[in-house]
Amino acid sequence: MTSASPSRSTAWLRVVTLAIAAFIFNTTEFIPVGLLSDIANSFAMKTEDVGLMITIYAWIVAVASLICMLLTSGIERRKLLIGLFSLFILSHLLSAVAWNFTVLVISRAGVALAHSVFWSITASLAIRMAPPGKRAQALGLIATGSSLAMVLGLPLGRVIGQYLGWRVTFLTIAAGATVAMILLARLLPLLPSEHSGSLGSVPKLFRRPALVGIYLLTVVVVTAHFTAYSYIEPFIQTVAGLPENFTTLILLLFGCAGIAGSMLYSRYSDRFPIGFLVTAMLLLLACLTLLMPLSGYPFGLTLLCLVWGLAMMSIGLAMQAKVLSLAPDASDVAMSIFSGLFNLGIGGGALLGSQVSLHLGMDKIGYVGAPLVLVALFATLLSVYRSVRLVHSRV
């Protein structure tokens, strides 16, 4: 912490700065979702093959999160964030001039390395800088920054790519990241590393059954979500037969719903933690199951995507908060594992969606994702049942 306690307005301004950084990182992580067709056309490739770029990015993050976090555990956090943004900006400049798909993937690998550390430390930094008693609201604000990436970043990036080319989209992200880096340098205080944990923390964390359960749940649910979401752009255009502008609208509404989900989380998660998570998982299950049946009805598909975005944001926030509560003594290590596993799910879902699209048809992506949510939901309810029985047996 800083030597003097900041005012509430200063504390919130610092959290907002982190939320802006989250907006930038989340925009670039998912921007390929809105540009798959354009990138595929540029390199004369199949959309399903270009989609593997999402898998490669996510799996680099999955592998690098813990390793990079441990390697940087002793670095002062403001300096670390500026270094991460420098790598981030240079990688996007390379993306903008990529002369073939291999170079584009290499440039995305640089972004993924920056990502792997950023999301390992951001949640704990937000909590650390939040005003007293406002931890959930600080996390909600970071989530809002992430959601705004879906509301503004992803649709805007798609529009820029549609009219000016996908390379200009990456240049625009690099410019935005430069502004964010300047804000971080000017507004954040010195942030010595605290409670980051060490390599010795890892086996201790994996001896906590509840934490391991959250980790497994994360992989399964995120895989289910990204089996369908990774290919929502070509799904809307080829399966639903709707125009490109409708795809942009859907991506916009999905992000808006994510903001609503973060607000609901801030308001209700403390009072109804289990009910909140189970309800969100039920909604996700319904959305994936109904994706194909509602694809022929634009209004129904729009409503489905609203509920889908709300549910997924709620699930992600609930699991992230649970990880932090179960590992307060090694929050950065715990979050790096969470980030890695989250991205393992992203990569697994994108790969599964690609294979489903190639071999079964893109219209099946929702049907393949839904059973995974059902498995996660059953495991959650079973865990709750066992916990209740254990409490009653001790009474």
Swiss-Prot record:
Induction: Activated by glucose, and to a lesser extent by other metabolizable sugars such as galacturonate, arabinose and melibiose. Repressed by cyclic AMP receptor protein (CRP). InterPro entries: MFS (IPR011701), MFS_dom (IPR020846), MFS_Efflux_Transporters (IPR050189), MFS_trans_sf (IPR036259), Sugar_effux_transptr_put (IPR023495). One of its GO terms (cellular component) is plasma membrane. Coiled coil: none annotated. One of its GO terms (molecular function) is carbohydrate transmembrane transporter activity. It holds the Pfam family MFS_1. It is a multi-pass membrane protein. It comes from the Bacteria. It is found in: Cell inner membrane. The chain crosses the membrane at residues 15-35, 50-70, 81-101, 103-123, 136-156, 170-190, 209-229, 246-266, 272-292, 299-319, 333-353, 365-385. Keywords: Cell inner membrane, Cell membrane, Membrane, Sugar transport, Transmembrane, Transmembrane helix, Transport. HAMAP family: MFS_SotB. Involved in the efflux of sugars. The physiological role may be the reduction of the intracellular concentration of toxic sugars or sugar metabolites. Transports IPTG, lactose and melibiose. PANTHER family: PURINE EFFLUX PUMP PBUE, SUGAR EFFLUX TRANSPORTER. NCBIfam families: PRK03545.1. Belongs to the major facilitator superfamily. SotB (TC 2.A.1.2) family. This is Sugar efflux transporter B.
